[in-house]
């Protein structure tokens, strides 16, 4: 009989023969060959079992023991009790106030127990109150140890021991053990022994110390002392020197005559009590030398002994102010953030800007689309109930059963399969708007194995963003079509393919959003200004200093701009190095680059003459300045050249004619001088006025003299310019009369000067 084995082999089998098995050696745990290397690599030994992610052995099977499951309520209670006892806030202070009143009552009763009138009544109440205090403190101590397990560093028995070694926990256990020992050994029929009461008074002090569980008082004191350690050490050192010196000198002066200063220790006691301004009066100097020394060192030493109190007081005040300052500045955080957000929306919602879209997209998501434009009136109530849970996404209602979760169409597919999504994808073409997909087509696309879903890339996101948007005209068209009666409404009642998508914001809605953003910006700005109110005097000083620096910078900028317009640039600019005011390369008054400063224009400050400036070799080659100051400089140069020519002609005339100065002075006194032209320094205007007045006097005096003997020359029309003739030609034309010759010449000069001034 041939039998086929389980492993596929064929061998003759007998009833008494042992069945052979083909396999690996040492796979069974506990087998003799299971300690081989190959066996350990294939199956592993029995001891190290497969662990979880946290390297803990998995507990599988029915017989395996399950670890104790921590309840959520257990953890919550542990955290709650730990916060109440270690970090009290809010109503948790009620318990700590109760403990404080309990300890304070024990302290008051222990004080009354020392008075004979109230000794008996206070001892009984103190006994009961001490028992209550011990019970409360004992329960609180064990609850603290148990609740500390909520912190990871205090978990386990080692963590509990670490928590118990904290200073305040050590004080708690000391007070608890000592109180139990005093009550057990010192009580005799509800009456305390004297030694027990004394020990109990000491325990009251420790109980008051434990009231500050967080140690904030001691931390504050330590920080103040550390911050002002140098000042304190200096004051204590000088005060100690004054104490030693004053005690020693008074001891030498009072040693033989005063019994209170028999030893140097008595003198040190007197010096300490005196310099600390306590003055018990048990010891005092009696000799005049001792009194004089005591008065001198008292005036010096008291000031140094009082310094530490002032240093610590100011240090505490500054530390408290530093602790309150961050709290005051934290109040400015929310107004500042709101101001930044509202300022950006105020900037981004500007209708003239077309490059900012994120803010408008935010409002497109938040603003509700009117439902009555998209929903037929017959299905409005039912769809409104269904659309409450749909926040602006595509919604379809089909008369087919709801598909399973695995067959549900994704948001992306629903958007692109919708007619408006296809319209957005087809860029508004009429062919794309008329295309509609049936649910069967969508299902066939989803079920086809050849279609592999692609990742939703940024391009898809942009396409879905376009698909989510629908123009207001399309929405109004849908509302009009929905309002028309006919067969379409009946078909929509049977199968409503309604879609809910967001629409673009209309211009009116954008204007409304813009107005709201402006109002929010103004309100946020006002709130932020209110939060910037000064906290203390230091804030006021800082604000004034910042404003002063800002004002100085603005004034400096304004001055530099004025100098750039009407004068040379300030020394800090590189333009001043290019055109220096002194040296061989400085521009002269005739150069187009020259322009007077503001003080020179208004007539203040020393005038800069041509002697102070040296003409450069390249002045004539410089291009003309087209600015206002360049043109004014050019006009001034022309006027100066004309003044030089006129001065030359007048000097020749006066020398040739020999006009007496008495006549000119008499005429000058009878005629007021004309005012000086504007935009000139006082020296230039004075010189110009003198020259002009002199010319007028000479001209009018000569013309009046010539009119006595000769007639006036024929008038020349103003449009024509007189011919340029020399002085000899005019002398030969008018004969031998010198006055007439000079009068005609000066008249021509006067007319030519008037025409040039008109030009």
Curated annotation (Swiss-Prot):
Modifications after synthesis and translation: KCNQ2/KCNQ3 heteromeric current can be increased by intracellular cyclic AMP, an effect that depends on phosphorylation of Ser-52 in the N-terminal region.
Comp. bias regions, Polar residues: 430-447
Extracellular side: 114-123, 184-196, 254-263, 277-287
Motif Selectivity filter, residue range(s) on this chain: 277-282
Segments on the Cytoplasmic face: 1-90, 146-163, 216-227, 315-759
Membrane-crossing segments per the record: 91-113, 124-145, 164-183, 197-215, 228-253, 288-314
Intramembrane stretches: 264-276
GO cellular component: axon initial segment; cell surface; mitochondrion; node of Ranvier; plasma membrane; synapse; voltage-gated potassium channel complex
Family assignment from sequence similarity: Belongs to the potassium channel family. KQT (TC 1.A.1.15) subfamily. Kv7.2/KCNQ2 sub-subfamily.
Role summary: Pore-forming subunit of the voltage-gated potassium (Kv) M-channel which is responsible for the M-current, a key controller of neuronal excitability. M-channel is composed of pore-forming subunits KCNQ2 and KCNQ3 assembled as heterotetramers. The native M-current has a slowly activating and deactivating potassium conductance which plays a critical role in determining the subthreshold electrical excitability of neurons as well as the responsiveness to synaptic inputs.
Protein name: Potassium voltage-gated channel subfamily KQT member 2
């Amino acid at each position: 009989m041939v039998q086929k084995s389980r492993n596929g082999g064929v061998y003759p089998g007998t009833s008494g023969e042992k069945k052979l098995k083909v396999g690996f050696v040492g796979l069974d745990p506990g087998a003799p060959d299971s300690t081989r290397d190959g066996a350990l690599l294939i199956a592993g030994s029995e001891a190290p079992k497969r662990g979880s992610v946290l390297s803990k052995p998995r507990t599988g099977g029915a017989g395996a023991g399950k670890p104790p499951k921590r309840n959520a309520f257990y953890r919550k209670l542990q955290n709650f009790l730990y916060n109440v006892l270690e970090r009290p806030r809010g109503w948790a202070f009620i318990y700590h106030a109760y403990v404080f009143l309990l300890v304070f009552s024990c302290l008051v009763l222990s004080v009354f127990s020392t008075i004979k009138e109230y000794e008996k009544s206070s001892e009984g109440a103190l006994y009961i109150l001490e028992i209550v205090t011990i019970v409360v403190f004992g329960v609180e101590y064990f609850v603290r140890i148990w609740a500390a397990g909520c912190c990871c560093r205090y978990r386990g028995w080692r963590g509990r021991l670490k928590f118990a070694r904290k200073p305040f926990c050590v004080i708690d256990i000391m007070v608890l053990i000592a109180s139990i020992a005093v009550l057990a050994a010192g009580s005799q029929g509800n009456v305390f022994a004297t030694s027990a009461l004394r020990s109990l008074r000491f325990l009251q002090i420790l109980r008051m110390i434990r009231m500050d569980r967080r140690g904030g008082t001691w931390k504050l004191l330590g920080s103040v002392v550390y911050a002002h350690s140098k000042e304190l050490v200096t004051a204590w050192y000088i005060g100690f020197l004054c104490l030693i010196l004053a005690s020693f000198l008074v001891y030498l002066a009072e040693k033989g005559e005063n019994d209170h200063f028999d030893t140097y220790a008595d003198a040190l006691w007197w010096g300490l009590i005196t310099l600390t301004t306590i003055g018990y009066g048990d010891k005092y100097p009696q000799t005049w030398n001792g009194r004089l020394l005591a008065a001198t060192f008292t005036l010096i030493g008291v000031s140094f002994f009082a310094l530490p109190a002032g240093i610590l007081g100011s240090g505490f005040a500054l530390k408290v102010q530093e602790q309150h300052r961050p709290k005051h500045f934290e109040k400015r955080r929310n107004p500042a953030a709101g101001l930044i957000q509202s300022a950006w929306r105020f900037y981004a919602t500007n209708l003239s800007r077309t490059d900012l879209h994120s803010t408008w997209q935010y409002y497109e998501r938040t603003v509700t689309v009117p439902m009555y434009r998209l929903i037929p009136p017959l299905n409005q109530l039912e769809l409104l109930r269904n659309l409450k849970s749909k926040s602006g996404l595509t919604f379809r209602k089909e008369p087919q059963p709801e598909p399973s979760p695995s067959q549900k169409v994704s948001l992306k597919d629903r958007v692109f399969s919708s007619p408006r999504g296809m319209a957005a994808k087809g860029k508004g073409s009429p062919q794309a708007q008329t295309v509609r997909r049936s649910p069967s087509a969508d299902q066939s696309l989803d079920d086809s194995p050849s279609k592999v879903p692609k990742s939703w890339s940024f391009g898809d996101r942009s396409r879905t963003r376009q698909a989510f948007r629908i123009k207001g005209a399309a929405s109004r068209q849908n509302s009009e079509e929905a309002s028309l009666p006919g067969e379409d409404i009946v078909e929509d009642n049977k199968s409503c393919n309604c879609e809910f998508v967001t629409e673009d914001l209309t211009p009116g809605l954008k204007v409304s959003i813009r107005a709201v953003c402006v109002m929010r910006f103004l309100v946020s700005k006002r709130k932020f200004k209110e939060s910037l109110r000064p906290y203390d005097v230091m804030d006021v000083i800082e604000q004034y200093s910042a404003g002063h620096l800002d004002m100085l910078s603005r004034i400096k900028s304004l001055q530099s701009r004025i100098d750039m317009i009407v004068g040379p640039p300030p020394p800090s600019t590189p333009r001043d190095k290019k055109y220096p005011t002194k040296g061989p390369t400085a521009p002269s008054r005739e150069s187009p680059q020259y322009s007077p400063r503001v003080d020179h224009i208004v007539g203040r400050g020393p005038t800069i003459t041509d002697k102070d400036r040296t003409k450069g070799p390249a002045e004539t080659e410089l291009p003309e300045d087209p600015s206002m100051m360049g043109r004014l400089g050019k006009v001034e140069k022309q006027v100066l050249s004309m003044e030089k020519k006129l001065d030359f002609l007048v000097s020749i005339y006066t020398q040739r004619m020999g006009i007496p100065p008495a006549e000119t002075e008499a005429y000058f006194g009878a005629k007021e001088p004309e005012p000086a032209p504007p935009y000139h320094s006082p020296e230039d205007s004075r010189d110009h006025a003198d020259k002009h007045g002199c010319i007028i006097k000479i001209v009018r005096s000569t013309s009046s003299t010539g009119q006595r003997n000769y007639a006036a020359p024929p008038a020349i029309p103003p449009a024509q310019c007189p011919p340029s003739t020399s002085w000899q030609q005019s002398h030969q034309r008018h004969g031998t009369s010198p006055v007439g010759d000079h009068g005609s010449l000066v008249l021509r000069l006067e007319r030519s000067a008037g025409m040039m001034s008109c030009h």
